[in-house]
Every structure is written in C-alpha cells, then in structure tokens.
Amino acid sequence: MTGHRPAGGRHAAAPGRAGRRIASSPMGKLPLRARLATTIGGAAGRMSRLAGRGDGSVIGGVIGLRVEPDLLALLAAGRRVVLVTGTNGKTTTTRLITAALGELGQEVASNAFGANMEAGLTAALGQAPDAPLAVLETDEKYLPTVLAATRARVVVLLNLSRDQMDRAAEIWMVARRWREALASAANCTVVANADDPLIAWAAAAAPDVIWVAVGQRWHEDSWCCPQCGSHLSRDELGWRCGECEFTRPPARWVLDGSSVIDSAGRVHEVSLSLPGQANRSNAVIALAVSEVFGVEPAQALARLRDVASVAGRYTQVERHGRQVRLLLAKNPAGWLEAFDVLDEPPVPVLLSVNAREPDGRDTSWLWDVDYRVLRGRPVFVTGERRLDLAVRLEADQVPFELVEGVDDAVDQVSGGRLDVIANYTAFQQIRVALGRAE
C-alpha cells in the first residue's frame, strides 16, 4: 500500500471503444456527435419524466450511447470522478459522499436515484455537463468497464455478498474482475473496507489503497480465503488465513461503535439523521473519500448530518393517520441491516417481496435470512412473491397476515407507526402507492 495522493487534475487520454482515444481537456467542448447525443438523450429523459414513466435517469443514457458509444468516456473527461460499488449501501454512500464534497463549493454530478449501469451514469453526467466532480454509484458487474471509461480518481469498495445470483456472476468472480481492473488503475485511490475479506483481496492489487475498518455483519459468503481457498479464522483483531499470508490489512480509519478514529488519530462522534450502524459505516467511508479531496472530517460530518433520506429510503410518510417508514432490503445482508433499525416491538412491520428482473428471479435467498427477530410484533406480508415469504416465515414460526398492499396493512394498524421492508421493485411500487415518497 502506498500513501494516497491529493485529488488533482485528470490524467491523459482515456481509451474509448475499439482503441479510440478520448482527449481530457477539462470542461472542454464535446465533439459534435457527443453534443448531439447528449442533447437527444436529455430530451428523451425529460419526455420520460413528463409522461410519468420514471425519472428519466436511464432512457436518456440509453439513447445517448446509441448515438455516441463513447459518450460516457467523453462526458467523464476533465472531471474528478468517484465510483462507488458493492452489494449493499451504494446509493446511500453515494449520497453521503456527494453531500460531503459539497463543502468544496463545486457542483457535483451524481446518479442520485441509483441508475447504476452505463446508461444511468451517462445520463447523470449529461445532466450536469459543467460539474467538475462526479460521484457515481456503479453496479458491481460494470465496475471494470466504467473504471476504464471514466479513469476514476477514487474507487470505493464497500462489501461483497450474494445478491441476484441468477443475474450477476458468482461473487468470487466479481472480486477477481475488480482485482484485475484495479491492478492497472493508474492515478486512482481505492477506499476499501478492510473487514470484508473479498473486498480486501480485490483492493490489495491496487497501487494506492486507503483501508477503512467499518465492520462486516454478514460473514456467510467469506469463510474461505479468496487467495488460497483455505478456511478463514476470525477474532477480535480481524480475520486471517491459516494457510497463506493473507490477513486483514491495518486500517487508517476505524469505526468504533458510534465514533470514528480518523487517519490522523482524532476521534469524532458519527451522529447522523440516517438510522443504524450500517449507515455509520457508510458515513465513515464518505469521510475517508472526502479527505482525499481535501475536506476535513469535522466539516464533512456536519454535512452528513443533513442527509435524512436517500431515494425514498428511511422516508416517513403519513398515511391514514399513521406514520409509515420505508426501508429497502434486497438480499440477506440487507435484510439483517433493516431488522437492526426497526422500532422495538410491538411496532408492526410490513414485508414485501417481488422477483422481477431487477430483483433477481430466484427467491431462494429468503431462506438465508433469520426472521425469528420479528416474533412479538404484528407482521404483514405482501408483494408478488408473498407466498414464498409466507412459507419462510412459517418455518421460523413467525405469525403473519397476508395483505394485498400497503394500504391494507395501514388500515389494520390501530395507530402510530408501521415499518415497511421491501426489495427493489416492491419498494418502488410502495413509493408510488404512497405518492412517490422521497
């Protein structure tokens, strides 16, 4: 590991498709074809929003890339780009980093609503053509491609666990592709979670790494050493392989309960509006990234406290005289994190699960979640795969009631509050039902 460099200007030309070189004149004029692609894509996004068919954060990029296949690289040229990836926490961490970098007083381009493949990233940059900074949530599968196109200044690696296994590759294959891409990422600083063995293995190949210790609640996908395949052991000092030299790297930032020890050894209280320990972990990552850009931790923390919801997550909505709080959980690790921030029993909870393309068709992951923590409170179940979830709750002896939708659950709550946990498309459906809660 080497010491990180202050975030400065961009490096030389980035490679486009088929070997084409992309000039990196900061904020310079785009080529005519790229300007045309951006204009057409922007118009398509606006039409999508006016037609009520979403926020336009994907369609504009899809059309723009059809007109100019190198549009992502062209729009990224001249900017200092941060890429954020991992199984869980991408959208929230992206939002927190964007908030912290606001301290610099410069416009920051970002895909705030989580459209995290090439089209969504392209649309986000096209909507902020003059922003010198960009913070982009990036789908795990697309990180190598996006890194090559954007020549990112910082890459954030949060965590890796099973997620949508019928869509994405096995997580070890994902980690290997990251490792290969990062090994040749010149002038890039990687901010990585030292407590996740797969993340540590992927990041270790990078020339410049800032290790951050923010914990790992879900261990089920990382009992084997990614270096040699032997068993990993864990104790209060971290994890290590008993067969090879692979061990948890020493961290420069350490989350300890509700406090963080920064790279200079100073202690800060991590006080947030967002609930839960997982969001403290996300916040510490944001602090480490913002320091790369010259933002002091105390200044960044003040901005992080102002973030109260993220693309509908953690939003509270009044519905029929009750307070409804929305929580997103897409996989076993995410459901455990959501359980951690539930109000104490007997506050009721509504669980909603779909299995559409963005969710992954395979619902067998439901059996990897321990639902016994929900005993002692009213539990309502809805969603297109509510029967799959019902069978799982029966197995854990958790009493529940099947309902048609969020309003049915709200109407059965005597008063006060209802927590809602839903996977991706179910979450979006509930947001729409509640008036597109932000």
Feature locations, PLM:
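A short, flexible N-terminal coil/short beta segment enriched in small residues
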Residues: 71-99, 271-273, 289-292, 301, ...
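Acidic, Mg2+-coordinating active-site environments of NTP-dependent enzymes
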Residues: 79, 157, 161-322
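Phosphate-binding loop of NTP-binding sites
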Residues: 25-211, 223
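Fold-independent oxyanion-binding glycine-rich loops
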Residues: 87, 112-113, 137-139, 159-160, ...
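ATP-dependent carboxylate-amine ligase
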Residues: 4, 8-11, 15-58, 77, ...
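Short hydrophobic/aromatic-enriched beta-strand-loop microsegments
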Residues: 134, 154-160, 208-215, 349-351, ...
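Buried hydrophobic packing segments
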Residues: 97, 101, 121-125, 283-293, ...
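Short glycine-/acidic-enriched loop or helix-start segments at secondary-structure transitions
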Residues: 120, 145-146, 166-167, 200-203, ...
